[in-house]
């Protein structure tokens, strides 16, 4: 490729990625030359500013027409821009959590934490704009490898080391399975470009090729199910969430999960809605596999909510809650239509606000008590009424109570499931039943906060970083719960 050709590309379309990459490089150099005894936490503010600028740059690119560069390996379209906004917002809020993370084994001398988190965020952004299997895989690995290191960054913690090891093993297996499925697609079509694959799979009318394509679909679904924590590939989630630092847990629960659904939607809708399925009506491979996806969604909702009932560790409880929410989103994928993409995006937006806000409060309480046990939430209303009300808002939204963004997200997916075909009525019923089950553990926390006496009588103050996260997330949860049209209008 000549220099003239390189200069002709519209590199300004990659401005957000360049900003995140440049910020990561600056932080790595600053960390290298800072004295060893210097507190590294102020680097979080530099990282936050970089991500905020990248977010503004992404908003500035919204009016731009869809364009692809680098031989269609990088594509900036409406899909990519919409999900990049979620990824950047989640990354920025996670960095604010990191600034005020103060356990005994904290991030005070871990400067690598901040640029590793930016590298993970960059990988997720590349996945959102990937137009080629190779680009997509590079982004996936950048996100995955950075996340493995972040999960075990507390090197002296045995729990963190154990969780990181489980994450590496499970993540490596899932990556191998995903790559194996991609290799089948490449073997059948002779190309790694996603658009070209979508055209080539339409020509696979031979039954033998269609069976191989179905195997590729299932292998990629299995591999990516690890990333989104769906049953039965969810086993790593509770241990990693509990062992990782709270900012990392929050990042994995929002940014990594969103990136997982980005790759699922980008690949499966583009490729497998065009692929024929032998002896099936309709003749799309994706639609012929909806029953399997629906089964995964139902099992994920049931198991996630059921096991969460017995948890005392708040991190493990939110881990199983995260699994259950993956099931709710999978309902939208099982009942797939073009309308459901908007519903999935809105659900991930709502989940970003309510989950990160809850993790900010959890971090403050667990840092003070040196434990994430549910009992430490007792009497929070007496110690900090505003913080208790904010946590109540997040819990109500996670439970799907009207007036919150979580309710709108669940309602849209529920109605979408009812509108597709009668077979999804069962899935919608499971969604309602498991949502009711979730009330038990969400309102169990609610009872601790408002109706149990506090062990500590001192006022609980919030550092500036955590306070910013709580305020922004509470406002977002209420605003999009009352006026959801703002988000949908912006998306359009």
Curated annotation (Swiss-Prot):
Keywords: Cell membrane, Membrane, NAD, Quinone, Translocase, Transmembrane, Transmembrane helix, Transport. InterPro entries: NADH-Q_OxRdtase_suN/2, ND/Mrp_TM. It is an enzyme of class 7 (translocase). It is found in: Cell membrane. Disulfide bonds: none annotated. It is a multi-pass membrane protein. The keyword Transmembrane applies. GO terms for cellular component: plasma membrane. The chain crosses the membrane at residues 13-33, 42-62, 79-99, 111-131, 133-153, 168-188, 211-231, 251-271, 284-304, 318-340, 344-366, 388-408, 426-446, 463-483. It catalyses: a quinone + NADH + 5 H(+)(in) = a quinol + NAD(+) + 4 H(+)(out). GO terms for biological process: ATP synthesis coupled electron transport. One of its GO terms (molecular function) is NADH dehydrogenase (ubiquinone) activity. Its EC number is 7.1.1.-. HAMAP family: NDH1_NuoN_1 (MF_00445). Belongs to the complex I subunit 2 family. NDH-1 is composed of 14 different subunits. Subunits NuoA, H, J, K, L, M, N constitute the membrane sector of the complex. NDH-1 shuttles electrons from NADH, via FMN and iron-sulfur (Fe-S) centers, to quinones in the respiratory chain. The immediate electron acceptor for the enzyme in this species is believed to be a menaquinone. Couples the redox reaction to proton translocation (for every two electrons transferred, four hydrogen ions are translocated across the cytoplasmic membrane), and thus conserves the redox energy in a proton gradient. This is NADH-quinone oxidoreductase subunit N. It comes from Geobacillus sp. (strain WCH70). The lineage of its organism: Bacteria, Bacillati, Bacillota, Bacilli, Bacillales.
